[in-house]
Amino acid sequence: VDFLERLMALNSSGPVRTQRPTLETALKGGSAPVLPDPAPHTVLGTPVTGPWKPGQEHIVLGLGCFWGAEKLFWQLDGVESTSVGYAGGYTPNPTYREVCTGRTGHAEVVDVVWDPAVISLETILRVAMENHDPTQGDRQGNDVGAQYRSVIYPVGTPEQVAEQTAVARDVVSSYAERLKAAGYGDVTTEIIPLAETPAGEYYLAEDEHQQYLDKNPDGYCPVHATGVTCG
């Protein structure tokens, strides 16, 4: 996002839509993952890329800066693992620097793994929606760019994807009504199965971004909650 585009976004009262790349204009990316051998989760001690235990599911969520978002989820009972990465765009194996150019199409996201016997997807999605402003488009507070957009990318078997999509639509629709009653605009959250996004994949971010606020307790990454609850 260039200076002028960011300035205009910060002075906008409605949802922001920044310029996004196409398949032809997106950065070409790399041939290898930026984190090929991730370490175990620094808080939970679990693998961040599986294999998952029988019955566990995962979903990819974007709600602005992924540092603070990841911490929200690893603190929940029933969440078995989290990691941060990039999804929703075109560029394969992108770096953080590339994503920040706005030329990959990716959002900063968290891959959340949970045990449905302990915590429901509805609860996880309520936490996600209540802890950012999903009416801002390509922006969260002073963070401007498509990488900060609100997204929900269901993952798994066809049955799991269908169920996750249905739950996500219900939670977002209900929350949109509560936001509107509180004076907010339309919700801009994308709900798309991960496999149907342009690249169709979730790419792990670099090691320094994984569990960032555990490694850097004084790190800065505010949550842009509206104060409106899901009820």
What are these model-derived regions, one by one?
Residues 1-231:
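Flexible coil/turn and secondary-structure edge motifs
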